[in-house]
A protein has these predicted regions:
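Regular secondary-structure segments
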Residues: 42, 122-136, 182, 186-189, ...
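Short, Lys/Arg-enriched, Trp-marked, Pro/Gly-tolerant hinge/linker segments that flank
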Residues: 107-117, 132-143, 152-183, 187, ...
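Alpha-helical structural segments
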Residues: 180, 227-232, 277, 281
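Generic protein-terminus/edge-of-domain signal
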Residues: 1-58, 77, 258, 285-313
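A hydrophobic/aromatic-rich effector-binding and dimerization subdomain
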Residues: 1-19, 67-134, 148-164
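Basic/polar phosphate-binding segments, predominantly the helix-turn-helix DNA-binding elements
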Residues: 186, 191-228, 242, 248-277
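Conserved metal-binding segment of the jelly-roll/cupin
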Residues: 57-70
Length: 313
C-alpha cells in the first residue's frame, strides 16, 4: 500500500503547550504536525515509518518525532498501547527560544540513550501524565516540571541540530501552508478538487505547489487526493451497507471505475474482494480523533487505573 501524509491537528485544551494521553493503536496513517511528539510503548509493539525509514518499537521503547516530521504507526498483531506527549513549539520559548529550531536526530531513543537514562525518561513521562490528569492548582506545575526533566534528558543525551533562521522560517511557512491545504482537502474531497484552484487560493503557481506537495508529503497531489477518497470510501463501506456505486460518488470519485482502480492500485484487490474480508459493521464507529484511524484513546479513569497498576505515585 502506498503511504501518504496528513496534517494532524492537535489542541492544547488541558494544559497550555502540552497534550498527553494513552492510546490503544492498531494503525495511524502517515501524518505530520507542528508539535514535537514522544511516545512510550507500554505494551505490544509497532512498526514506525518515518518518511523512507522504519523502526521496530517494542515494549519500553520511547519514540521521538520532530515537529513537521511525517510518521506512520502500525501495530504488530495486538494493538500497541502508547503513552503520548505532544508539545507545541511555544514550550519554554521565553527562556529558551532555540527550542523552536531544534531537530533531534533519533527516532527510537533506545539507540541513543543509556538504559538508566531511558528508564528515567519513561518515568518522567509517567509522572507527567499522573500530574496532567490531576485537577488541582499545583498539577500544571508538577506536569511541566516533568516535561522540563524530559527535555533536559533529550538535550543532554541525544543528538540534535539547530535550524538556521532561514530554515526555521521556511519550515514554519510551509507547515502553515500545508495545514491550510490539507484541511481544505479533508473537508472538500467529496467535491471536484483541482490543483490549479488550490494554487490560486494560495497565490502560487501550479508547478510550485505540485513540487511543494511532493517535497512535504512525498506523494503527488492527485495520488494523495485519490488515497483520501479511497479511505473515506473504505470507511463508508465498512460501517454501512452502502453500494459500491453510491460510495464512489459520495467520496468524490467521478466514476465507480476509478474507485475500482484505486482499490487495485493501493490494496491489490477489487472492492468486492476487500468487502469479503471487511464485511459492513455499523457498530464500528469512527474515532473521535480521526475517522480513518484504527485507535482508541483511553479515558482519564482508565489512565489512572493503569498508573495505579504501575505504582506511579
Amino acid at each position: 500500500m502506498e503511504s501518504y501524509n496528513e496534517y494532524e491537528l492537535i489542541s492544547h485544551s488541558k494544559l497550555a503547550d502540552c497534550t498527553m494521553f494513552i492510546v490503544d493503536m492498531v494503525y495511524r496513517p502517515m501524518h505530520l504536525h507542528k508539535e514535537l511528539e514522544l511516545c512510550v510503548v507500554l505494551s505490544g509493539s509497532c512498526r514506525v515509518s518515518t518518511d523512507r525509514h522504519g523502526v521496530e518499537a517494542g515494549p519500553g521503547e520511547v519514540l521521538l518525532f520532530d515537529a513537521g516530521s511525517s510518521h506512520e504507526l502500525c501495530a504488530s498483531g495486538v494493538p500497541a498501547r502508547l503513552l503520548t506527549l505532544q508539545i507545541s513549539n511555544s514550550f519554554c520559548a521565553r527562556f529558551y527560544p532555540q527550542i523552536r529550531s531544534i531537530r533531534f536526530g533519533c527516532r527510537g531513543l533506545s539507540a541513543c540513550l543509556l538504559p538508566e537514562r531511558l528508564t528515567a525518561l519513561r518515568r518522567a513521562m509517567l509522572l507527567a501524565l499522573r500530574a496532567y490528569l490531576r485537577d488541582t492548582p499545583e498539577a500544571p506545575f508538577a506536569c511541566m516540571a516533568q516535561v522540563n526533566e524530559i527535555f533536559a534528558i533529550l538535550l543532554s543525551d541525544t543528538p540534535y541540530r539547530v535550524l538556521s533562521d532561514t530554515e526555521n522560517m521556511t519550515q514554519t511557512r510551509n507547515a502553515e501552508r500545508m495545514h491550510r491545504i490539507l484541511h481544505y482537502l479533508e473537508t472538500h474531497y467529496s467535491e471536484p478538487v483541482r490543483l490549479s484552484e488550490i494554487a490560486e487560493r494560495e497565490g502560487l503557481t501550479q508547478t510550485y505547489l505540485s513540487h511543494l506537495f511532493r517535497e512535504q508529503l512525498h506523494i503527488p497531489f492527485q495520488d494523495y487526493l485519490a488515497r483520501l477518497r479511497l479511505e473515506a470510501a473504505m470507511l463508508l463501506l465498512r460501517q454501512s451497507d452502502t453500494t459500491l456505486t453510491d460510495a464512489a460518488y459520495a467520496c468524490g470519485f467521478s466514476d465507480p471505475k476509478y474507485l475500482n482502480r484505486s482499490f487495485q492500485k493501493n490494496l491489490g484487490m477489487s472492492p468486492r474482494q476487500w468487502l469479503q474480508e471487511n464485511r459492513p459493521d455499523p457498530s464500528r464507529a469512527p474515532s473521535a480523533e480521526d475517522p480513518r484511524t484504527a485507535q482508541r484513546i483511553l479515558t482519564p479513569d482508565e489512565c489512572r487505573a493503569l498508573l495505579d497498576a504501575l505504582e506511579i505515585p
